[in-house]
């Protein structure tokens, strides 16, 4: 559904957080107007109704509904402006039942700007929490006044986000890379710090947070670019420890059991601060020493790099589940590939799935957080110019996405404002997570302790590369790595380079991620009497991955047989042509065109989905407007070829001379695919592309394909693609 154009924040925004009301529908803004759009679920489908403007302001940054408490109480809507928040109540009109009267109940002003997700309602009552970069204020009486209760934030860090737990007893505030917990006393209307879990550090800055079940929260941490850049800048130096503290560095371990009680708070916090500060402090070059080994006796200066991040999992953004009970426990931690700053997060309580996205990336990832199963992932990919500006679950299977489409701008200069103009629309995507075989409770904890070992970074890379030789050349993404040493020992590899991301599943379905263990009982059963560092256990039940591997091997074998058969057919054709020429005499050679007027066609090959959503394009020379079928077969490694004409796929054949019995025109675009594979299992339903941007071709369901009048190919022109 198209909503029109509007001015939205570039980053940090989730315009659909607490924006859907069961009666009044969706509240959204274009930057100035407050609009209500009717939203209904009918037979499992979303139906959008009429929209009406209920207010207009100079600047609106966000909207959020208070939780519905009772039928006889007015409905509250918080309107977030740049530096203040106004709370409005909606009451039914006594004159017309279809109309609603709005009136302002209170206005909250502050000296600092409100954070992009700075209005958070209590899950069970009309208590509003307002966040700035330095303050957290709770307003328990928004129906009548602006009386507030301030949280005691005794830290110098910057507040990013906050949320209430589902039980409504605890407020969790993300300050920098740490979580601060507060207990709410509803009777006294007071907020005090939790004595059993004061501060819990998660190693990286928290971008977004949401409540999951009971006293558990899910947080998304950004990629620690400051640590990686700090490491890369000093990678050739061996920096000694601080002279004041000669103890070895305390390096965090991702798979380590992370828990915090009252006694261990100070010691654990101090040990990790010493690590993070080593990447942020300026380097003292006057104390740089070099180590000289026996094998380096002839070297003048030997400087050794110290890599603290590679292999620890800190070179990626993460989704972390944190449980607050008697002690804080990190119950699970998985990587978020391809997204640098995951500032959008949403949770569905019924399906136990989390959606993670970013305002600056067109990818949305769906994770399963069920404790007894391996977390799955589903990828939702938007257009290149589209960005998710808000996400929320309507049901356990439907995800509502507010999409902002940006016009193409010059990326040479950084944007000068925090907001930009977008073409706003609403889309609904179905969540289809494949269920993994259930794991018993006795096996689940053991699974967490062993699953990260076989699926660490190196093994996962080998597994992905084994699926297809071209798998790493498919979906574009960003990979940031701090491992800058090559096999020949020369440092200096690019820190950030564009690769083809392996994050998408082979069939846009679900693949199992590596779950890094964080909580284990003290008495876990041993699978072997050998030490831990020598035991290697297989990952638990990966039928989909094994099926894909066997399917890939079968596909490669069949392709090799087809190539041999095609070569034999080509040899027979050449022998037959030579025989005919000997009997009938040489044919007069045709006049060839000038190289300046090169006649060629663009052949676009749509590959099967389990090789990745990839479109390969080649430029092929025409011979008198004709294409030789064998040339096309050899170019793309196909035995049977289907060509798209209007909305139909047509199998191509050859005449007695080996040419496709059609005439083609220069610079014509031809779309082909493998004709020997099953349509229902392998290919998408349809194919669409833009005439001016063939490089951004993608496959979509239900879109009509462009028409072609002719096709053909002969000698291949290298370098034209």
Curated annotation (Swiss-Prot):
Phosphothreonine found at: 530
Coiled coil regions in record: 556-584
Compositionally biased region (Polar residues): 520-537
Residues recorded as bearing Phosphoserine in the entry: 299, 468, 501, 523, 686, 690
BP-aspect Gene Ontology terms: protein complex oligomerization
InterPro entries attached to this UniProt entry: WDCP
Effect in UniProt of substituting residue 454 to S: In a breast cancer sample; somatic mutation
GO molecular function terms attached to this record: kinase binding
Annotated phenotype, changing residue 540 to A: Loss of interaction with HCK
Protein name per the record: WD repeat and coiled-coil-containing protein
Post-translational modification summary for this protein: Phosphorylated on Tyr when associated with HCK.
Assembly and oligomerization: Oligomer. Interacts with HCK (via SH3 domain).
Disease: A chromosomal aberration involving WDCP is found in one subject with colorectal cancer. Translocation t(2;2)(p23.3;p23.1). A 5 million base pair tandem duplication generates an in-frame WDCP-ALK gene fusion.
Residue ranges of WD repeats: 55-98, 154-194
Segments for region (Interaction with HCK): 539-545
Keywords on record: Acetylation, Chromosomal rearrangement, Coiled coil, Phosphoprotein, Repeat, WD repeat
Positions of modified residues (N-acetylmethionine): 1
Name of the gene this protein is made from: WDCP
Residue span of region Disordered: 520-553
Organism expressing this protein natively: Homo sapiens (Human)
Cross-referenced PANTHER family: WD REPEAT AND COILED-COIL-CONTAINING PROTEIN
Pfam families reported in the protein's UniProt record: WDCP (PF15390)
